[in-house]
Amino acid sequence: MPLLIQQNVGGYTAFLNRSWEEFKVGFNDSSGNYWLGNELLHQLTVTNRYKLRFDLQSRANHSNHYTAEYSTFLVLSEQTNYMLHVSGYSGNAGYDALSHHNGLMFTTYDRDNDPWTYSRYNNNCAVYEGGGFWYKNCGYCRVNGARGVGGDFYWLSLPGGGLMQTSRMWLTCR
């Protein structure tokens, strides 16, 4: 049975300015936006083998739904800043956007671990994008981004310039 680990149903402010601690323990809001929590992601993925699936809805055409699946998904401990390991892409979402983030540490506005250097946003992709994630120069997969903030709520190669209406991330057993 799939386990929902992320849901962004509007891309406005649900993930905006969430702290390291909030992403660590998880959160939800009354609109249905949700993050399971990095610590639980770590505990789940180091003890079992999981696949990761994204369900994405394009903002350009709300009836178009896309999937991206990764046969390997692992989140390391907080001592590694919840480093991401992902591989084995398949799906109809076009370009393999998440593999660009493989091997990266999680970044939030108050704990900057991304290798970006752009002083306008304090060299921090979470500030620019509006939400925490595994960033590399802000990257190609911005499912925790906020609409109208920086690079927006985005998956490279989706129709309509990559902008999304909704995203969901699921864990399924391999």
Task: List where the protein language model places each region.
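Long mid-to-C-terminal scaffolding/interaction modules that assemble large complexes
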Residues: Q7, R59, Y128, W170-L171
